[in-house]
């Protein structure tokens, strides 16, 4: 299985983020415009949290709060668990499954370099399985029919 760095290389676009003082509506607009389900919360180049669509639904929509008046700091998950570029994706998958995470911010020497989603991990698993199938077919066909 690949590393976090290789999964990040498959992604395109800029790092999507908001500030903790921004209103939730800004985080939702970023998610909609960039077709993502979470945004990192970064203040002064420091990761302070992550906010997801689920956070917004449960902490803003359900209680009847106004997304235009509610700061991201009120709904974000502060001090999120992070991973490093050289971490194996298999470890990320295990952590996501065990802790119920769908997104993991990636830090390199304390600097935010991206975010890994469960979708990124699944794509990598599928690529690995496809390679395994190709290898097995090649092995089986090597000797021809009937071996």
What spans do the regions from the language model cover?
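Tandem CBS (Cystathionine beta-synthase) repeat/Bateman regulatory domains
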Residues: 1-147
């Amino acid at each position: 299985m690949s590393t976090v760095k290789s999964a990040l290389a498959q992604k395109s676009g800029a790092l999507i983020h908001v500030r903790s003082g921004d209103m939730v509506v800004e985080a939702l607009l970023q998610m909609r415009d960039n077709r993502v389900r979470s945004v990192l919360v970064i203040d002064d180049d420091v990761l302070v949290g992550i906010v997801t669509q689920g956070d917004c639904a449960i902490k803003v929509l359900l209680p009847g709060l106004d997304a235009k008046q509610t700061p991201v700091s009120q709904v974000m998950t502060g001090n999120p668990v992070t991973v490093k570029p050289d971490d194996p994706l298999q470890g990320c998958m295990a952590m996501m499954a065990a802790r119920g995470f769908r997104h993991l911010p990636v830090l390199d020497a304390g600097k935010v370099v991206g975010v890994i989603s469960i979708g990124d991990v699944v794509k990598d698993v599928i690529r690995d399985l496809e390679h395994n199938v190709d290898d097995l077919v090649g092995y089986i066909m090597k000797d021809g029919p009937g071996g």
